[in-house]
């Protein structure tokens, strides 16, 4: 499986969602699954959540994956409250993610 790591900025919101979505979709178009490094992202808006969900759906339609790694407490709270955490494979570390991918 071809995989690329994409590192999110400190926020994913209405100001940067289009760029993030375009970059994730470009990775998927290359035939790669995406590991989304969220270790510095401390805020995600509803627009940002839609980007994640849309990217996950596109990945699935292509037989690829979207993995979330290193979610901060702030973003984890938002994802738990909205129920979005149930839609994604979420890992604490890159090592955990790599082990899951390898199996």
Positions of PLM-derived features:
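Short beta-strand/loop segment at the start of cytosolic alpha/beta domains
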Residues: 1-7, 19
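Short acidic-hydrophobic, aromatic-tinged amphipathic segments that line or gate anion-handling sites
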Residues: 89-93
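Conserved beta-strand segments of the P-loop GTPase G domain that flank and frequently precede/overlap
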Residues: 6-8, 36-37
